[in-house]
UniProtKB/Swiss-Prot annotation:
Gene induction: Repressed during activation of CD4+ and CD8+ T-lymphocytes.
Residues modified by glycosylation: N144, N407, N431
Keyword set, alphabetical order: Cell membrane, Disulfide bond, EGF-like domain, Glycoprotein, Hydrolase, Lipid metabolism, Lysosome, Membrane, Signal, Transmembrane, Transmembrane helix
Superkingdom of source: Eukaryota
InterPro entries (alphabetical): EGF-like_dom, NGX6/PGAP6/MYMK
Enzymatic reactions: a 1,2-diacyl-sn-glycero-3-phosphocholine + H2O = a 1-acyl-sn-glycero-3-phosphocholine + a fatty acid + H(+)
Protein name in UniProt: Post-GPI attachment to proteins factor 6
Protein source organism: Homo sapiens
Pfam families noted in UniProt: DUF3522 (PF12036)
UniProt cross-references to PROSITE patterns, sorted A to Z: EGF_1, EGF_2, EGF_3
Domain (EGF-like): residue spans on this chain: 497-533
Residue segments, region Disordered: 322-343
Subcellular location: Cell membrane; Lysosome membrane
Amino acid sequence: MGRAGTGTGGEAVAAVVAGPLLLLLLARPPPASAGYSGKSEVGLVSEHFSQAPQRLSFYSWYGSARLFRFRVPPDAVLLRWLLQVSRESGAACTDAEITVHFRSGAPPVINPLGTSFPDDTAVQPSFQVGVPLSTTPRSNASVNVSHPAPGDWFVAAHLPPSSQKIELKGLAPTCAYVFQPELLVTRVVEISIMEPDVPLPQTLLSHPSYLKVFVPDYTRELLLELRDCVSNGSLGCPVRLTVGPVTLPSNFQKVLTCTGAPWPCRLLLPSPPWDRWLQVTAESLVGPLGTVAFSAVAALTACRPRSVTIQPLLQSSQNQSFNASSGLLSPSPDHQDLGRSGRVDRSPFCLTNYPVTREDMDVVSVHFQPLDRVSVRVCSDTPSVMRLRLNTGMDSGGSLTISLRANKTEMRNETVVVACVNAASPFLGFNTSLNCTTAFFQGYPLSLSAWSRRANLIIPYPETDNWYLSLQLMCPENAEDCEQAVVHVETTLYLVPCLNDCGPYGQCLLLRRHSYLYASCSCKAGWRGWSCTDNSTAQTVAQQRAATLLLTLSNLMFLAPIAVSVRRFFLVEASVYAYTMFFSTFYHACDQPGEAVLCILSYDTLQYCDFLGSGAAIWVTILCMARLKTVLKYVLFLLGTLVIAMSLQLDRRGMWNMLGPCLFAFVIMASMWAYRCGHRRQCYPTSWQRWAFYLLPGVSMASVGIAIYTSMMTSDNYYYTHSIWHILLAGSAALLLPPPDQPAEPWACSQKFPCHYQICKNDREELYAVT
């Protein structure tokens, strides 16, 4: 069967030597353990695929993983993945292990956080490998997959889960981890085609023989048989057959070893995948010097479908347009040829086809329903089958939801409706087994009874293929009770981007990798999981309201600097503080998830105004402390605010958006204070009370607030630490505002309007002079 192996290397085979390494891989023959030898190189060709590297992120949700999509050609016999990882050299770079997930047909369903999935969700663990980065800044790993399934293969890579710490962009040193996968495909070009019921002679030497057989629609069974086996190196028939492809994470590839097996050697495959080529590899087990001769025969058992008549429906809906799965309406001439060339099942019918309408509603959003828009009739003689076409290549990025509901009046205590959901081919063996297993796929079972008339199934990221829903009526206690029984089942079949739109505590986001689109949920308020349904760390409604009140009411602390500014006639500064208080309050009221939400404007507008107000408040406070000339101060107020607005438009979360203007304002303030100290030959401000009761407490509050804002905030304590930041910022502004200008002396010159008299103070004598 297919193997997946890993290997790690050091700096000598790092990303910088990826080109020479791939040339060596191209020149080297496949390993002998995979069943290949140098003589088989004549019939094998190699192809190389690569994608641009991407910077990895620490995992917090599915959007943190970097997704790569590769197209594997048909007749591939070996995949060699070269996984290259590199990092920057610096103190910020630590040892880490990159996790790489693989899946065939759809993006891998991963769960690094160990969260729970919604009820009725079918999840298969992903196949993954780890690439450590410890002593060297570069590392690589290789993964081999023999006999891979053709079509789309997806690779997802990510760093370990994040620490949930909120860091300012540009403040803390960062480390870039870069990942690049490359794919080397070995495919066979010399392959023999097996025709149904026609023996195909084969002679095996030291290299394997590659065969393939086409399985058309409505094939119930495929029988592979080895006949007339002759070997000169051992007794019996030393041949190993490998049938079918490898699909990670699950693998149902069949391996038949005929040594010592009953003669003739046979392999029966129920419900093989329809409408595709099935690859068969024959290998000799006698060693390099022995030969084995045999004849391979493929026998197909045709399935006669009973089709639901839809002509009256089509005639009554001529003005409507449907995209129907017409392949399920009636047997085509090809199906009749299959019956003549293969074997026809003796029963009159093996399944009942129900035509299905596919309605494309939006991106990764499809609605399936029976063409007659009524329920499906389920009986006991044959399965009722519905085909869901999810083979466009763009349908694997959502979630397939299936909901069944049985008619209450028709369900009796002794009857059970059994359903199976399978890809590639329907499950038809309800009379012999209920495990929903076809030749190369483990299906998903559902059941309806008188006690449970509803059944649901959710398949995240379904594989690109035709999916089939099979239903049949069963009577476990007495089969005769089901002979005349009929149950109508209502089906609700959807492909949705996100289940329930991620609920009230999540947001469904559409992600893109080149032209491929897929969806995922981003959760809030402590909710986690695939659809934001895991409440193990969730906040209660009371906690959400308390958090909202903390973040909004803490802005009332800005009333203190507003009052101080008005009292000291700093009206422009008071206006800036009022603006900051207003938009910070309503931004945080809109930023909350769940029920405690209030948005008076769009979220983006509120966020921009909040960031602008915060930067402008710090800017005007520092400039006000500089005690500039009135005209110059207001000019700098305006210019600084315009610069902050421009920088926020360029990068809203950049650290230098606020730090740059604030440092410039601090330089102006320090220069003015130094000038006054030199001019007056004493410390400025001159009053020790000003230093002790205003400046030092204000600077201390601002320093503590900056420390909390830059180094202590996490996703868990954000509501408390950010509220403290609001209080400290507003309190420091109230303390740092300078006192008003000194009032005019009684004898200072003042202009009397409108009489145009000027009263002046005489420095030599206390007399008034009227001019």
